[in-house]
Amino acid sequence: MNTLLAFIAIFSVLVFVHEWGHLYFAKKAGILCYEFAIGMGPKLFAFERNDTIYTIRLLPIGGYVRMAGEEPEQPTIRPGYEIGLVLDEKDTVKELIVNNKSKHPEAQVVQVERIDLVHDLFVETIDEDTGELVRYPIDEKAFIVQDEVAQIIAPWKRQFGSKPLPKRAMAIFAGPLMNFILGFVILLGLSLYQGVTLSSEIVINGENSPAEAAGLQDGDVITAVNGVEVDSWKEMTTEVKKYPGEEVSIDYERNGEALQTNATLSQVEVMPDEYEGFLGVSGVPEFSLLGSLQYAGNEFINMATSIFDTLGLIFTGQFSLDYISGPVGIYDITDQAVSLGIQTVIFFAALLSINLGVINLMPIPALDGGRLMFLAYEGIRGKPVSPEKEGAIQFIGFALVMLLMIVVTWNDISKLFS
């Protein structure tokens, strides 16, 4: 149960922050956002506020912000259609009833001669008594009602495509940006709470560790590993990681006296068939805002670059599905994190948040990076890709992403039962 709650909490926070970034900058640019969704599939909960429907959906595989103009959302109303008009006291259209007009006795039923729901916002009809053409202005926040479902209209000035390119790009980039900010803030908060390890002073971790076997003690300060001088915890651990399972020389100071010993390092598998050396020591934490900022920045860079390194294996032929995880694999890792304590769970959330930001910036159609790629093409070419072509490419990209998710999930399940 703890694992399930942690998984749901991490997923919800990461997706919420990502989609909130899209929503905030889209609304700031004046773009109408029809829906803000956490999850996919059937709707579990919904409420409406400021022209946007906020929903929680069943499947924890993502989320979305549906912006006006990105795809056809409104029912089509053409000349010759018979619709109902709900007017205010100034004869401005507040609602356009597409069907089931008998359920709306307040609506005036007319036959459409001309209609513009995008630019000039009007509907023209013939007055049955006089035979004259009558034009009704349409409120920019009028609703179209079809099958008793009301949806606000999207005038051109509130559509995604009407905004300057930088504002559109920011509305797309804001999702990954918020994940990066969240990841950094989590790392900073953890380091301020736990303290950060700056010096190479050590504390022995458990009995029978390589450090204890080599005669090292709490309070020793390591000054060199295999002849390479180290002045900080980061430099020391970087050198140790280079020698998995090997014997190394350790220079250290104890009570001001320079000493040396040899240690046979353990090895830890960090990726399939990839190992790092392990000495079995911890650092001595220090509480410093500057040190915490430095730690958070370094960890952020390390996490981001490790993701890029993994993705880079695709181009060298060394990539394996074991290097990535879908929802099932993430749930399994969450279970391991829960067993290690709340601070490990929070650290894992930071890693996932940064991971989500990086993956979403990949130039793959259906991801934010793919959408930014289309905007970059528009900026260079001077005009956007045709909606038909972009829609087809986005659909293919989405299908490939879904296929990859299915394959990865199957691989995760296979690993669980192997």
Swiss-Prot record:
GO molecular function, one term: metal ion binding
Gene3D superfamilies, per database record: 2.30.42.10
Catalytic residue positions: E19
PDZ domain mapped to chain residues: 183-267
Pfam families, A to Z: PDZ_2, Peptidase_M50
One cellular component term from this protein's GO annotations in UniProt: plasma membrane
GO biological process entries: proteolysis
Principal location: membrane
Binding site for Zn(2+): H18, H22
Cofactor(s) it depends on: Zn(2+)
Key words, A-Z: Cell membrane, Hydrolase, Membrane, Metal-binding, Metalloprotease, Protease, Transmembrane, Transmembrane helix, Zinc
Residue spans crossing the bilayer: 5-25, 170-190, 345-365, 390-410
Subcellular location: Cell membrane
Keyword check for Metal-binding: yes
Organism superkingdom: Bacteria
InterPro entries: PDZ, PDZ_sf, Pept_M50_Zn, Peptidase_M50
Enzyme class: hydrolase
UniProt similarity note: Belongs to the peptidase M50B family.
NCBIfam families to which the protein is assigned, alphabetical: RIP metalloprotease RseP
Function description: Is responsible for Site-2 cleavage of the RsiW anti-sigma factor. This results, after a third proteolytic step catalyzed by the ClpXP protease, in the release of SigW and the transcription activation of the genes under the control of the sigma-W factor.
PANTHER family for the chain: MEMBRANE METALLOPROTEASE ARASP2, CHLOROPLASTIC-RELATED, REGULATOR OF SIGMA-E PROTEASE RSEP
UniProt-recorded name of the protein: Zinc metalloprotease RasP
Encoding gene (name): rasP
